[in-house]
Amino acid sequence: MKRYEITYTENGRFEIINIYGFENYVTFMEENGRYIELICIDEYDV
């Protein structure tokens, strides 16, 4: 299982703050039950 940490910004968008491991894509479930699919790149600069 890959671990992703995301944070929401004031305008409702979100950004990845940490990625542990790599995966082609990941699906997050929001509190209201909506699903968001994010495309992840092979390398991530922190």
PLM region spans:
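Short aromatic-glycine-(Arg/Gly/Cys) micro-motifs in beta-strand/loop hairpins
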Residues: 1-13
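A structural detector for beta-sheet-dominated domains
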Residues: 7-9, 20, 39
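A short, exposed loop/beta-hairpin motif centered on an aromatic-Gly-Thr core
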Residues: 11-23
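Generic solvent-exposed, charged/amphipathic alpha-helical segments
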Residues: 23-30
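Short, mixed-charge low-complexity intrinsically disordered segments
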Residues: 30-46
